Curated annotation (Swiss-Prot):
UniProt organism field: Bovine parainfluenza 3 virus (BPIV-3)
Region (Disordered): 424-515
Binding site for RNA: 179, 189, 194, 259, 349, 353
Subcellular location field: Virion; Host cytoplasm
Function recorded in the entry: Forms the helical nucleocapsid (NC) in a ratio of 1 N per 6 ribonucleotides, protecting the genome from nucleases. The encapsidated genomic RNA serves as template for transcription and replication; encapsidation by N is coupled to RNA synthesis. Forms the encapsidation complex with the phosphoprotein protein P. Before encapsidation, the newly synthesized free N protein, so-called N0, is chaperoned by P.
Entry remark concerning the domains of this protein: Ncore is globular and carries regions required for self-assembly and RNA-binding. Ntail is an intrinsically disordered monomeric domain in the C-terminus.
Keywords in alphabetical order: Capsid protein, Helical capsid protein, Host cytoplasm, Ribonucleoprotein, RNA-binding, Viral nucleoprotein, Virion
Protein's name in the database: Nucleoprotein
Extent of Polar residues compositional bias: 434-443, 491-503
Domain of life of the native organism: Viruses
């Protein structure tokens, strides 16, 4: 009977996700124009000019989002010698039908430098005027951070080569995808953070860095046009990383792909890592048994998705909501308790959710600090650990854990996914609260270890109560001493904070450690 209950969740999920048969009825599709470069365009400067033109059209608010996404697809397909084959392999989609037009150069034409839009059968004059004669709202200077004020297209192509310059634009579109779907508020900051690595290794030149506004516009297109996201994901799936002939652009796409994989599934994988893989005795609790069974069913569901499993959130797979931590709250709360002790970086992770089980959260912290729970008997036998070494290790672990016996409090709120995604707060922008006629405190605001603030300038009751009594007393004493010094100092002095002596600084650092 118990085994039947254990497998019920998995069988139930299987019945929900599997097909019941029946005819597949096609839905409505958008027809989207894709532009590819024909064999008559051989000049690298012309190719780079067209790449920037595609990007400009994709940022034109006068066009529909579907067509703006089409211009981004046109840009991405320029990385391949055969754009038609690329779209055939990766562009199959239930929402759009791609119509490919070729851009050729006709020596007999003077207008638009001889560039013309055509197919094998005919020339499209109106499309040519629409493509090259449009008064774009977004010109090529505004969409780049530096506006190409120091370098022309010819200079960049001559110095770095066309493939390198094209790759700089394409890789930035891929970086935008990392945050465009799963973390809208952190898009701009996340983009420039990840871009920095590509700037340092020379992949992206400073003259070709997209502006912040352009980044947000492209992110908006990705959110509204799932067909574009699907194409990019299929590109990652079908790209054979085992090949020895990957181009530099393809290698860089794979690097960015590592950030895209499993995006939006952080809670699921953190629960497995800190809740299950640590294999502590708390897993035997009956309270956690239902959530463990639920997690087992989710793991089987994840594996059943095959190569598309890491992208279920990016692709908005109907089952991606099943992986939310609210579906296994007790186990997630326990895992987060273990995480904030074992990994200091996890203390920035937002755990203050409505479904947080505070008792399991504290239990996770308690067992993570316990030396006995952290030792694996299986590894002890495999490594041949002696009893003396085992006792010595226990002693060291107890000494370390005894220095911090207080429980970490939940951080953040339910509306924020990751605290690290928020904009860094500038200390000078924050002033002390109104203190009436009392002099303003000179203590640096960010010196208080337990004080946190949200970007909306609000503080919860929990955050205010988290300031320890000892810290309050130290702050009052330091403020009193500083105020006494103000009264004794020269009235003409305009910068009293610079007169703080070394004793006061030592007091502050001794009170808060090395924060």
């Amino acid at each position: 009977m118990l085994s039947l209950f254990d497998t019920f969740s998995a069988r139930r999920q299987e019945n929900i996700t599997k097909s019941a048969g029946g005819a597949v009825i096609p839905g409505q599709k958008n027809t989207v124009s894709i532009f590819a470069l024909g064999p008559s365009i051989t000049d690298d400067n012309d190719k780079m000019t067209l790449a920037l033109l595609f990007l400009s059209h994709s940022l034109d608010n006068e066009k529909q989002h579907a067509q703006r996404a089409g211009f981004l697809v046109s840009l991405l397909s320029m990385a391949y010698a055969n754009p038609e084959l690329y779209l055939t392999s990766n562009g199959s989609n239930a929402d759009v039908k791609y119509v490919i037009y070729m851009i050729e150069k006709d020596p007999g034409r003077q207008k638009y430098g001889g560039l013309v839009v055509k197919t094998r059968e005919m020339v499209y004059e109106k499309t040519t005027d629409w493509m090259f004669g449009s008064d774009l709202e977004y010109d090529q200077d505004n969409m780049l951070q530096n506006g190409r004020s120091t370098s022309t297209i010819e200079d960049l192509v001559h110095t770095f080569g066309y493939p390198s310059c094209l790759g700089a634009l394409i890789i930035q579109v891929w970086i935008i995808l990392v945050k465009a779907i799963t973390s809208i508020s952190g898009l701009r900051k996340g983009f420039f953070t990840r871009l920095e690595a590509f700037r340092q290794d020379g992949t992206v030149k400073s003259s070709l860095v997209l502006s912040g506004d352009a980044v947000e516009q492209i992110g908006s297109i990705m959110r509204s046009q799932q067909s574009l996201v699907t194409l990019m994901v299929e590109t990652l799936i079908t790209m054979n990383t085992g090949r020895n002939d990957l181009t530099t652009i393809e290698k860089n796409i794979q690097i960015v792909g590592n950030y895209i994989r499993d995006a939006g599934l952080a809670s699921f994988f953190n629960t497995i890592r800190y809740g299950i893989e640590t294999r502590m005795a708390a897993l035997t609790l009956s309270t956690l048994r239902p959530d463990i069974n639920r997690l087992k069913a989710l793991i089987e569901l994840y594996l059943s998705k095959g190569p598309r499993a890491p992208f279920i959130c990016i692709l908005r797979d109907p089952v991606h909501g099943e992986f939310a931590p609210g579906n296994y709250p007790a186990l997630w709360s326990y895992a987060m308790g273990v995480a904030v002790v074992q990994n200091k970086a996890m203390q920035q992770y937002v755990t203050g959710r409505s479904y947080l089980d505070i008792e399991m959260f504290q239990l996770g912290q308690a067992v993570a600090r316990d030396a006995e729970s952290q030792m694996s008997s299986i590894l002890e036998d495999e490594l041949g650990v002696t009893q003396e070494a085992k006792q010595s290790l226990k002693k060291h672990m107890k000494n370390i854990s005894s220095s911090d016996t207080t429980f970490h409090k939940p951080t953040g709120g339910s509306a924020i996914e990751m605290a690290i995604d928020e904009e860094a707060e500038q200390p000078e922008s924050r002033g002390d609260q109104d203190q009436g006629n009392e002099p303003q405190s000179s203590i640096v605001p960010y010196a208080w270890a337990d004080e946190t603030r949200s970007d909306t300038q609000t503080e919860s009751v929990t955050e205010i109560e988290s300031i320890k009594t000892e810290q309050r007393n130290i702050r009052d004493r330091l403020n009193k001493r500083l105020n006494e010094k103000r009264k004794q100092s020269d009235p003409k002095s305009t910068n009293i904070a610079n007169d703080t002596n070394q004793t006061e600084i030592d007091d502050l650092f001794s009170a808060f450690g090395n924060n």
